[in-house]
Each structure stands twice: as structure tokens, then as C-alpha cells.
From Swiss-Prot:
Residues holding a nucleoside 3',5'-cyclic phosphate: 372-493
Entry keywords, A to Z: ANK repeat, Cell membrane, Ion channel, Ion transport, Membrane, Phosphoprotein, Potassium, Potassium channel, Potassium transport, Repeat, Transmembrane, Transmembrane helix, Transport, Voltage-gated channel
Segments on the Extracellular face: 83-90, 156-158, 215-241, 262-265
Entry text on domains: The segment S4 is probably the voltage-sensor and is characterized by a series of positively charged amino acids. The pore-forming region H5 is enclosed by the transmembrane segments S5 and S6 in the Shaker-type (1P/6TM) and contains the GYGD signature motif which seems to be involved in potassium selectivity.
One Pfam entry name: Ank_2
Alphabetized Gene3D superfamilies for the sequence: 1.10.287.70, Ankyrin repeat-containing domain, Jelly Rolls
Name under which the protein is recorded: Potassium channel AKT1
Domain spans labelled KHA: 790-857
Gene this chain is encoded by: AKT1
SMART domains assigned to the protein according to its UniProt record, in alphabetical order: ANK, cNMP
Amino acid sequence: MRGGALLCGQVQDEIEQLSRESSHFSLSTGILPSLGARSNRRVKLRRFVVSPYDHKYRIWEAFLVVLVVYTAWVSPFEFGFLRKPRPPLSITDNIVNAFFAIDIIMTFFVGYLDKSTYLIVDDRKQIAFKYLRSWFLLDLVSTIPSEAAMRISSQSYGLFNMLRLWRLRRVGALFARLEKDRNFNYFWVRCAKLVCVTLFAVHCAACFYYLIAARNSNPAKTWIGANVANFLEESLWMRYVTSMYWSITTLTTVGYGDLHPVNTKEMIFDIFYMLFNLGLTAYLIGNMTNLVVHGTSRTRNFRDTIQAASNFAHRNHLPPRLQDQMLAHLCLKYRTDSEGLQQQETLDALPKAIRSSISHFLFYSLMDKVYLFRGVSNDLLFQLVSEMKAEYFPPKEDVILQNEAPTDFYILVNGTADLVDVDTGTESIVREVKAGDIIGEIGVLCYRPQLFTVRTKRLCQLLRMNRTTFLNIIQANVGDGTIIMNNLLQHLKEMNDPVMTNVLLEIENMLARGKMDLPLNLCFAAIREDDLLLHQLLKRGLDPNESDNNGRTPLHIAASKGTLNCVLLLLEYHADPNCRDAEGSVPLWEAMVEGHEKVVKVLLEHGSTIDAGDVGHFACTAAEQGNLKLLKEIVLHGGDVTRPRATGTSALHTAVCEENIEMVKYLLEQGADVNKQDMHGWTPRDLAEQQGHEDIKALFREKLHERRVHIETSSSVPILKTGIRFLGRFTSEPNIRPASREVSFRIRETRARRKTNNFDNSLFGILANQSVPKNGLATVDEGRTGNPVRVTISCAEKDDIAGKLVLLPGSFKELLELGSNKFGIVATKVMNKDNNAEIDDVDVIRDGDHLIFATDS
């Protein structure tokens, strides 16, 4: 086990290291795997072999580059101005050489990338062989100390120093990486590179100029000797500055004439130096020109585009208003590009998952408020957001033209626009649309020409959705398509506009004739209470027992709405009158709970029974609503109101919690058991005792006496003095909440995810069910952690016999404040009624305890 844990830790460390390496954005720091192959960076290298892309090794390389900069200055300087080593330069040189000697040794342990296979080679023999036949000799020679070179030849000191310039290759690799690194500005990196090249060229030329003069047999006949007599006796600093001065004037082609070549050697060197300057100047000018042109290319392209658009408009005699729209759109496009708002180009370069996440973050909250998508699932909304395209429109530009083909619809993100009617020959503004409104949806959904021209009033940002893409998504989400269509029709009905009224009638006729491209189902027709459309769809062969995501069939919906014609049509086409939805509801119950007596009668005539559904749930619902008439109607139609719902809660449990004595009497007459436990172990008698319902307790005692039923208690459960089993905290479930706070079981979440199967049948459901005790009872600890504690409180100084049932606060201070507020005293003590013991900590209070508040007096 320990070995496995160690191996797991090593793998985790390796993954973390690789993740850290992969966090760099430089294009040159990673290896692209071949097609179909995994990344080579996931391959663990052999022992003592370092990856060339290792983060620590990259830091070492950066440190060596700093030493290379020193070498680039000191090597030409020592070659030109010094004949033998001088401290402190000689000491510094040896320290630098020592670091590069360490790098030579380290290179034998650094893997390399095979250019043919693009794999990292970690075989140390192959690494050594490749290094020995490539750079090893030059690296070794460049690290020979100056003192050793002097022993070979007194004239070899400067030459050995020049061999160290071999290290400059590291600087070139560094600049190549920096140019691709997003953390550094490309323009300034290129400028820094050009400056370094120029300074190095000037420095080398100055050292060579002085070397030629210093080694001449006649110092007076040299470029520096002609102006400075006995220049060898001048300070080293003065000689270096003079050499740099002549080198820079020659490079810049200024040529003041104060310094010039005197002897033949100097003339020859000057010729080649000026030829080199021609190439260097061309290189510098070319690079700077490229950088400047790149920075102004957008402006140049914009001017060319504007000029081309203007020429096109004049050549084709376009009206002034259309010309203005063209130029305004091009100017806006240039502005968005120059300000970094070219979002579509940026999004198109990203993977779909990242695009979807960005769109969800930016636009989901906006689309969630659009009337057309009210009530659709999160799945559909997420898919639609991912396909939205953001666009900018300048003021007074036409977004949609009247009577054009419906190819797109738009959602206004910000700005305002006008709906313009131009059918009459004169333009008239119908209404104004603002941020959050949708435009063009009628044409897209109904596949008819656009009703109005949409013209922006000021700068607008819109989200565009293509019709084909939209319909493809809807085809895969038929239930949501029904909701969208219903939202559209409801919106048209609420507008109270003559034009929209005609559109509504036309759409309803198209629906009835089945000429809509959207996938329509029977549930949609039942929701619309449209028996003509329902009949049309049934004649097409649609299954009358089809269900939505919650298992509700068209017959459920029609019965709930009381649409008798729709119910008769569905039954005529053999719809199942006893079909159940996901909550156990049947059409007969839907009609009963809404009070549609005619529909109830028709369903009963066609064989519908209340027992086909979850009668226990129906009875509890009637008890929660306090509807005794509905409860009697369940019994009238053959339902057993004593049956519990899935949680074990019966209608009697609920009636006791609601303190509905009449309903309790009726349920007892129907044979309800006062000792029947729910899944938490609570019986109706326990609830009546704990909640202090004296009338109900008396009713239970009378009923128990009549039936002579004795309550059997388990010895494993502690007994309270009241004679009621201590079953832990009773959970106030939605099934037995007061009716004023209860939400009907038929109300569903508007943003619920689509149900695929029952949760209880999933792995998570199985595991969750295992945590519930088989006998439905919970220990004291479980009751305290899973549910709040309820206690009965009373005051010793008040005439309060029954007390009040409250939830136990979280602290003793809050408990004292609760007692003070409830009884109008300054409570300072809390005692347990059972043993008269004073309590000073809420942790010792159990569920069901009776607490007495008292003052110091």
C-alpha cells in the first residue's frame, strides 16, 4: 500500500510539473505531438536526464545569456586593447568560463529533440554522441583560460578570447523566443534586437580599428597617431572612446574628416567595414520600415476600402442615404477592429468549448429574459447562446428590410431601434425596440416575409441567430420548441395590435393546417386548447399517449384545463384514460382538482379510475389544501384515502399538522390508522402529542378506546414521560406544510433540466437510498445533524399550560432572547420540565424537550 501511495504521489507530482510547464504561452516551449499520438511531454524521461523544456533548465539558460552579453563586450575589447590578461577582467573571465564549463557537463544530461521523429531522445549515449560531433569542440575551446592560451603563444591571447563569441548563438535563440512570447511587446523586442546588433557591430569595429593602429610598426602613421601623438601613453578609456567615435561616425556615414585611414591596412579594413555598413543599414531600415508599416497597415486598408466604396457608390448612382449607410458601416467596422472589439474573429479562432463558455458568460443572462425563451430548458438556452453572433450597427442603418426573406432574427443587447412600416409608400414608425427585445422572430418562426423594417436609432449591439441553425437545434428539443411557439402566440395575443392580431390569426390557421416548420406535438395543441389543431395532428397519426419531459400526456393537460372537446378527441383516438405522469397523477385527478365536473364525468364513462394514480398523494394534497369536499370526492370515486404517499406520510398525518379536526374525523371514519408510521417513524398520534393539539388528542383517545387498539413501543427507543416514543425530529416535508405556503405539485421549475430517467434508479439514487435506515427511524445524533430540533417552551410566571412549539436556536443566548420575546419577560434561566434541572448549554437539549423560562425573581 505504501509503495502504491508513493507511486501515486510521483505521478501526481509529474502531472503537476507538466501542467506548470504547459502554462507558458510561448510557441517555442512545447512539442507538438504527431497526429493520433499523445503529447511527448507526458513521457517520463530516464533517470538523470533533463528535458530541454524543463522550467529550471530554462532559468539556467537565461542566466547564461547574461554571461554571454558580458562575453560579447569583453572578448573584442581584450582582443584589441590588451596584450595580456589583466585583473579584474582575467578573474571575471575565469569565473564566466567556469559557468560555461558546468554547462558543457550538464549538456551530456539534457535530452534533445530528434528533428526526424520529433521525439525527445533520452538515451545518454545518443546524447553524448550527438553533442561530441556538433558543438562540443567549440564549447570546449571557448572555455580555455587566458593564462593557458598565453603558455601556447604570447600572440594567441586575443585570438582565444574571440573564440568565446561562439556563445552568441544563445542570444539569437533568446530573441527568437521573446518575439513569440505574449508577455513581451513584439515591437520593442525587435527594436532591442536591432539596437544590440548595432552596438555590437560598432564595438567590434572600434576594437579592430585600434588593433590595426596599435600593431603598426610606425604608430605616428595611423588614424589615431596622426591626431594624438604618443597615443599609447594615453589612458585606456580615452583610446576606447576615440575608437568608438570613429567607428560610429563611419557606420552612420557622417565622416567629419577629423579621423580617416592613413596607411594601406586601415584603408583596406575601412573598405570592408563600409561595405558591411551598407548591408547593416539595409537590414536596419528594412526591419524598422516593416514595423512601422505593420502598425499603419490597418489605417491604409481602411482608407483603401472607404475609397473603393465611395467609387462604387458614385459609379452606380446609389442614393445618398444608402451611401451614408455603407460608409458608416465601414467606419464602425474599422473602429471595432482598432479598439480590439473584433470579437467574431477572436471567437472563431478558439475551440467550441471555450467559445460556448465565453458566450454563456456574456449573453446568457440577457437571453434568459427574452420572452420567446421563457420556460425553456437550460440545455436549449445554452445551445442557442453558443450559436449567437454579436454584431455592431451604426445609427440609422437598416438591420432588417420589410418583406425580405426571414434568414435571421436578432436580440438587442444595447441601443434602440425603430420598427418602420414602408408598405404604404411613406415610412411610419410602428414602435420602438430597446435592449433585451427580440426582432425578426415572427418571420423566422412562421417562415413568412419580415413584417417591418428595423432601423437603428443609435449605435447598437445585436446578437444574430441564423434561422437554419435555430431550427436544427429546435428539432432536437421538441418540447422546448412547443414552449417557444406558445410564448410567441401568447405575446402576439397580449400586444393588442391590429397588425399582430392578423398575424396571430394567420399563424393559428397555419398551425391548424400543419404548415409550420417547427415540430408541433399534441401537448402543444392541448396547452393552446386548440381542438382543431389537435384533430389535425391526430389525423396525421401522432400518438395520443405521447408525453412531455415530465410524463404528462395531452389528456393530462386537456383534463387540467377543462377543455372538453380536446378530451373527447383524445379519447376517441384511444388515449389511455388511466395514464400516469412522473408524479403519479392521472387525468381524472387533474380534472377533479381543478373542479371540471363535465370532464370528470366523461373520463369516468371511459373507464378512468382514481386508483390508477397515486391515491395517497392525492389525499395528502387535498388535506394540505384543507379541501374536505375533494377528499370525499376521492372516496366517492373509489379511492382509499388512508393510503400513504411514497414518503409514508398519509392524509391523516397532514390533517393533524394542519389542525383540521373535521378532516381528521372524516379520515378516522374511513379507517385511517392513528399509529401508522411514516418513513421517519412518526405517527399521527405522535404529531398530535408533540404539537399540542388537545382536541385531536382527545379524538384519538376516543377512537382508540372504541377500537381498543394498544400502541406497542420498542424497547430500543427511549420513552418520554408523555408516553410518546422519542423518534427524533419530525421533518416538515412539503407534503405536510401549511396550505398557504404549499406549492401545488403540478407547478414545475421553469428552468429545470430535461429528465432522462428516475433518480432512484441511478447510481447516485441507489447510494442515497442506502443512507436511510431500513426501519425509518433515526438515532438522536442523526436527528440532530439532519434536522433542526423542536422543543416546547413555557414560562413559569405566565399561565401557559400547553406551551409553544418552536425550533431550537443555535446558541444559548439566542434561546434566552427567544423566551424573552415570546413571553414578554427578561429570561435569565432555562430549566427542563421533566427533571427541573437548569440548562446552560443548548447541546444538552434533546428533540421534544419541554423547556421552562424564568427570571431571577
